């Protein structure tokens, strides 16, 4: 069988499905959520430097950290694992924010108790808000511009914060965010440069969330699910 025939046959089988995809799209349900990505920083470089065994241990430590923190809060769903990162979702930003704060504080503790000079244990986090289509796939998945924007926001590298929030999420949940202002400040809006958005035709504006870690430990409100 000639290669050209094989290619033509495979292409026809794909094109034949497109009409079915158009029809099935209208049946997909919309889900409006707060979204969060938590990423293990420099995981690939750490594996290259330290080898696969230590890289595996660090990766499993990260995923255990995520799962142990979110298990106390039934409002947070682990949608999927993406390499050395996770996509989380909730109806409100509050449970995601509290999970991320706890994850960050524990990461800071691990960084101090298990010192690593070149690639210390660190996480990077981002939030967004918006509608996404729930896809019909073997594993649960979603498709939407709010998740696309969040993925781009995760490219931000800052010396002041490792937590960013999409402007839409900030606007929608601003009053909730203010409840944590005894240890948390929010930057002025910033815009992602085209080079950081993979030429996305939509502007992305975000803010940095800066945590005062000493004042966090004096905070006696909220975090209800972990105080039980």
Set out the residue ranges of the language-model regions:
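Catalytic NTP-binding/metal-coordinating core of nucleotidyl cyclase/transferase enzymes
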Residues: 14, 18-98
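Detector for Asparagine
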Residues: 4, 42-45, 68, 73-74, ...
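Acidic-enriched, low-complexity/disordered segments with a strong bias for Aspartate over Glutamate
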Residues: 30-31, 39, 84, 91, ...
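Intrinsically disordered, glycine/charged-rich C-terminal tails and inter-domain linkers
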Residues: 1-24, 159-228
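Glycine-centered flexibility motif
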Residues: 28-30, 51, 83-85, 130, ...
């Amino acid at each position: 069988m000639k290669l050209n025939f094989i290619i033509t046959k495979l292409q026809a089988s794909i094109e034949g499905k497109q009409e079915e995809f158009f029809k099935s799209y209208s049946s997909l349900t919309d889900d409006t959520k707060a979204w969060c990505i938590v990423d293990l920083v420099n995981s690939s470089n750490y594996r290259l430097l330290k080898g696969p065994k230590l890289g595996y241990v660090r990766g499993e430590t990260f995923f255990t950290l995520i799962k142990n923190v979110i298990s106390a809060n039934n409002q947070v769903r682990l949608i999927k694992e993406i390499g050395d990162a996770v996509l989380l979702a909730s109806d409100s930003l509050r449970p995601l924010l509290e999970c991320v704060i706890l994850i960050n504080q524990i990461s800071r503790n691990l960084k101090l108790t298990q010192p690593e000079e070149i690639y210390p244990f660190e996480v990077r986090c981002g939030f967004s808000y918006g509608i996404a289509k729930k896809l019909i796939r073997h594993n649960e998945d979603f498709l939407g511009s709010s998740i696309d924007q969040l993925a781009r926001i995760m490219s931000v590298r800052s010396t002041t914060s490792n937590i960013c929030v999409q402007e839409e999420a900030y606007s929608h949940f601003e009053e909730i965010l203010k409840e944590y202002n005894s240890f948390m400040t929010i930057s002025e809006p910033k815009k992602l440069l085209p080079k950081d958005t993979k030429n996305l035709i939509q502007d992305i504006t975000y803010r940095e969330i800066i945590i005062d870690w000493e004042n966090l430990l004096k905070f006696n409100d909220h975090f209800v699910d972990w105080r039980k």
